[in-house]
Amino acid sequence: MRRELFRKIKRVVVKIGSRVLTDDEGALDMGVIGRICGDIASLRRQGRQVVLVSSGAIAAGRSELGMTEKPRTIPHKQAAAAIGQTRMMRAYEESFAPHGLKVAQVLLTREDLASRQRFLNARATLDALLGFGVIPVINENDTVVVEEIKFGDNDNLSALVTNVAEAGLLVIMTDIEGFYSADPRSNPDAVLVPLVQGITREIERAAGGSGSSVGTGGMATKVAAAKKAAKNGVPTIIVPGKREGIIATLMAGQEVGTLFLPLDACLNRRKHWLAYSLKPAGRIIVDDGAREVLLKKGKSLLPSGVLRVEGRFERGACVRVCGSDEQEFARGLSDYSSSEIARLAGQRSSRIEAILGYRYGDVIIHRDNLVVL
């Protein structure tokens, strides 16, 4: 199955974690980087295009600056990222050069992907670079980003990049063999799970949540990334990044790591952007009847189904849609501001103009701008 699945894939996103790129002292491991670049060069010779999402800038900068511990303040993280990113790019440039490949640095923030125009510009840039045979190396722009607009980690970023790049496969390279039934570092009975078809709450619980002293993402963030990629119809494979020839091994269809297969029902690219690239500005709490209609019938959200609104936002903002239990089940672009929704909650659509003195339409969120998660 794996051989047939991977044979058809022409564009791959490869995400490399900090623990893969660095040695035990936290310095860049040029031997590992060289081997990975050699593997990627082999994919290029097969006619496949590769987009690299690389962690390691802060770790590399920390080593260059002589920091003995992971930086904790934002200025220290950004200083480490500033010096580390140049070191990372130099390492990739030197490692790809013997294979006749050039690299390009692409630094993104969440705001870049939240704007539909900038999102499409990023897609066009990646298409152009790949057309020239260049390897784009993507990282979050840690030097300028603030906590409120961070992607969170590069696992999340790599899942979003699969949509930007219109890729057919996401490869996440980490420091363990793949996804286990429990944490193998603390549970000797943990077993490797070779295939996951549908990410359930049990799978998410088994993933845990802790990261490392070098990177920011644990297995939980990798499973979350696989879930987002699956919603885009893209399979994800988590593999041991330091193993020699690992990319060639997995692309040959051999059973290595953990393969997450996409869901049967996936989102179109615009709705995937809406669900995962935008940062929600508030919450709309709806009654059980509205929740049922949105989940099972794919209808628009009417004011009559709204119980209350939380947060302050303007018309056109992305908002979470939650049931009466306050659990999020959908996201969408609101046709009305939070103050307007507060006045319209529980009312019939026919009364919108009487209440506000104007109307933008009959719905709070149109079904075309609503995504069930």
UniProtKB/Swiss-Prot annotation:
<keyword id="KW-0963">Cytoplasm</keyword>
<dbReference type="InterPro" id="IPR001048">
    <property type="entry name" value="Asp/Glu/Uridylate_kinase"/>
</dbReference>
<dbReference type="GO" id="GO:0004349">
    <property type="term" value="F:glutamate 5-kinase activity"/>
</dbReference>
<keyword id="KW-0641">Proline biosynthesis</keyword>
<comment type="similarity">
    <text>Belongs to the glutamate 5-kinase family.</text>
</comment>
<dbReference type="InterPro" id="IPR001057">
    <property type="entry name" value="Glu/AcGlu_kinase"/>
</dbReference>
<dbReference type="GO" id="GO:0005524">
    <property type="term" value="F:ATP binding"/>
</dbReference>
<feature type="binding site">
    <location>
        <begin position="174"/>
        <end position="175"/>
    </location>
    <ligand>
        <name>ATP</name>
    </ligand>
</feature>
<keyword id="KW-0808">Transferase</keyword>
<dbReference type="InterPro" id="IPR036974">
    <property type="entry name" value="PUA_sf"/>
</dbReference>
<dbReference type="InterPro" id="IPR011529">
    <property type="entry name" value="Glu_5kinase"/>
</dbReference>
<dbReference type="GO" id="GO:0055129">
    <property type="term" value="P:L-proline biosynthetic process"/>
</dbReference>
<protein>
    <recommendedName>
        <fullName>Glutamate 5-kinase</fullName>
        <ecNumber>2.7.2.11</ecNumber>
    </recommendedName>
</protein>
<dbReference type="Pfam" id="PF00696">
    <property type="entry name" value="AA_kinase"/>
</dbReference>
<dbReference type="GO" id="GO:0003723">
    <property type="term" value="F:RNA binding"/>
</dbReference>
<keyword id="KW-0067">ATP-binding</keyword>
<feature type="binding site">
    <location>
        <position position="154"/>
    </location>
    <ligand>
        <name>substrate</name>
    </ligand>
</feature>
<dbReference type="InterPro" id="IPR019797">
    <property type="entry name" value="Glutamate_5-kinase_CS"/>
</dbReference>
<dbReference type="Pfam" id="PF01472">
    <property type="entry name" value="PUA"/>
</dbReference>
<feature type="binding site">
    <location>
        <begin position="216"/>
        <end position="222"/>
    </location>
    <ligand>
        <name>ATP</name>
    </ligand>
</feature>
<keyword id="KW-0028">Amino-acid biosynthesis</keyword>
<comment type="function">
    <text>Catalyzes the transfer of a phosphate group to glutamate to form L-glutamate 5-phosphate.</text>
</comment>
<feature type="domain" description="PUA">
    <location>
        <begin position="281"/>
        <end position="359"/>
    </location>
</feature>
<feature type="binding site">
    <location>
        <position position="142"/>
    </location>
    <ligand>
        <name>substrate</name>
    </ligand>
</feature>
<dbReference type="GO" id="GO:0005829">
    <property type="term" value="C:cytosol"/>
</dbReference>
<dbReference type="InterPro" id="IPR005715">
    <property type="entry name" value="Glu_5kinase/COase_Synthase"/>
</dbReference>
<dbReference type="InterPro" id="IPR041739">
    <property type="entry name" value="G5K_ProB"/>
</dbReference>
<dbReference type="InterPro" id="IPR015947">
    <property type="entry name" value="PUA-like_sf"/>
</dbReference>
<feature type="binding site">
    <location>
        <position position="15"/>
    </location>
    <ligand>
        <name>ATP</name>
    </ligand>
</feature>
<dbReference type="InterPro" id="IPR036393">
    <property type="entry name" value="AceGlu_kinase-like_sf"/>
</dbReference>
<comment type="pathway">
    <text>Amino-acid biosynthesis; L-proline biosynthesis; L-glutamate 5-semialdehyde from L-glutamate: step 1/2.</text>
</comment>
<keyword id="KW-0547">Nucleotide-binding</keyword>
<feature type="binding site">
    <location>
        <position position="55"/>
    </location>
    <ligand>
        <name>substrate</name>
    </ligand>
</feature>
<dbReference type="InterPro" id="IPR002478">
    <property type="entry name" value="PUA"/>
</dbReference>
<keyword id="KW-0418">Kinase</keyword>
